[in-house]
Amino acid sequence: MARYVFITGGVVSSLGKGIAAAALAALLQARGYRVRIRKLDPYLNVDPGTMSPYQHGEVFVTDDGAETDLDLGHYERFTGRPANQQDNITTGRIYRNIIEKERRGDYLGATVQVIPHVTDEIKNFVLEGNEDYDFVLCEIGGTVGDIEAMPFLEAIRQLGNELPRGTAVYIHLTLMPYIPAAGELKTKPTQHSVKELRSIGIAPDILLVRADREIPESDRRKLSLFCNVRESAVIQALDVATIYDVPIAYHKEGLDSEVLSAFGIDPAPKPRMDRWEEVSHRLHNPEGEVTIAVVGKYTGLKDAYKSLIEALHHGGLANKVKVNLDWIEAEVFEREDPAPYLEKVHGILVPGGFGERGAEGKILAAKFARERKVPYFGICFGMQMACIEAARNLVGIEDASSSEFGPTREPVVGLMTEWLKGNMLEKRAAAGDLGGTMRLGAYEAVLKPDSKIAQIYGSTDIHERHRHRYEVNIDYKDRLEAAGLNFAGMSPDGVLPETVEYADHPWFIGVQYHPELKSRPFEPHPLFASFIEAAIEQSRLV
């Protein structure tokens, strides 16, 4: 039978519940347990697919095509277990399910209410499909006290009563702020947060307390006394250099031991921390460093590129170098010469994005990389802009553009209206809904055997995750290839271009998919490992 760990947050948002959940899952895995993590998001959107990156950050796409919270990316990177549609739920999805049931008459004329109908739907989500797991970790989004989170907190309160005794543990993540004028950390915000949590019927078993310095024993005793938590269960969560130091730090503080003790598991299997120690050692002892320019349009919020950032660091791990990121807003290149910004970097990456803003700047970045022989990695939109650049400057199609930006006589990039998903033909209308209508999830691509990208993968058959509505127009393939841009990867039916590259360039690759979503610290994605390797070679020339 699965045991459940419910993780809530208090005082302020963005304390790192997702990292805490992922780190705890990794620690339990290190002891040989089978672990699943689920995220419960209180917002009313059905999923984050149509939300602004500035509001939500990255949309993490799973193999089965779910558009989910970026925390699921942390879950995958820390545990290696691929997430799916059933690992993330939102209030919007809960309400949609309930309304559909009500319209079908499933409630037999009952008045549909938050309790029991909404809470039952949440509980069903938490409990479903856990037969093969020893532990299920559930992160509750938001902060205790948020009105949107109340149904979720009520649902996990009920689960604490309904599950067999000893199979549910509550962890509350809080903040102890340091007040310079007083010269001390303050416990009061945590006390009030726990008071709020207890007022709705949840008594935390463990306090995970964020702080920027060591928490004195006297403060831990104080929190234990006023929050009614064992002193050993007041665990400090200090700031660390990288997120991959968190599992080691939490293990040293005894988080995993305290969780197992709360479940009455004693003695517990000893953890194997060697691979985490190896990752930490490599991160803190690089043998060199490279600088990568990221030319994007959401650079004001780095969370919009969370998986991309981590995948670049994984590429650094594979090559034992530190990867420095130079963030450049693409629109800058529409006003200024790109050369002063890009001459000293060792690689240029143009990530995914939507819309016309910044597109010309990304095209200029691709042109600079092609002409100056600087390693270039174009992902999704970045591949599309590289193709438009080639069409304009190598083929001579001056009006080459994307239909995403408006009507154009030369749609080198166009809207996909149909594509194969397995044996099914997916169709989309230009005037259809935006949410959940893109080409989403894992799709197969076939690579040319003699291509650079096939050599990097060590295979001609790959499966990668996609999230796009527009695609390079196959009608321009022959002219682009004649100009030197090799279409090295295609969909199995030969209709959708998946990868492009230049044979006469040290490293210039564009991919329509998002390889960053499948990179792990222990298994860096081969494209990112190869890109950083090329950047190392470039660093010797700059």
Swiss-Prot record:
Its EC number is 6.3.4.2. Residues 291-541 form the Glutamine amidotransferase type-1 domain. GO terms for molecular function: ATP binding; CTP synthase activity; glutaminase activity; identical protein binding; metal ion binding. It catalyses: UTP + L-glutamine + ATP + H2O = CTP + L-glutamate + ADP + phosphate + 2 H(+); L-glutamine + H2O = L-glutamate + NH4(+); UTP + NH4(+) + ATP = CTP + ADP + phosphate + 2 H(+). GO terms for cellular component: cytosol. Residues 1-265 are annotated as: Amidoligase domain. ATP binds at S14, L15, G16, K17, G18, I19, D71. One of its GO terms (biological process) is 'de novo' CTP biosynthetic process. The active site is at C380 (nucleophile), H514, E516. Mg(2+) binds at D71, E139. L-glutamine binds at Y54, G353, F381, G382, M383, Q384, E404, R469. Allosterically activated by GTP, when glutamine is the substrate; GTP has no effect on the reaction when ammonia is the substrate. The allosteric effector GTP functions by stabilizing the protein conformation that binds the tetrahedral intermediate(s) formed during glutamine hydrolysis. Inhibited by the product CTP, via allosteric rather than competitive inhibition. CTPSs have evolved a hybrid strategy for distinguishing between UTP and CTP. The overlapping regions of the product feedback inhibitory and substrate sites recognize a common feature in both compounds, the triphosphate moiety. To differentiate isosteric substrate and product pyrimidine rings, an additional pocket far from the expected kinase/ligase catalytic site, specifically recognizes the cytosine and ribose portions of the product inhibitor. HAMAP family: PyrG. This is CTP synthase. It comes from Brucella abortus (strain S19). The gene is pyrG.
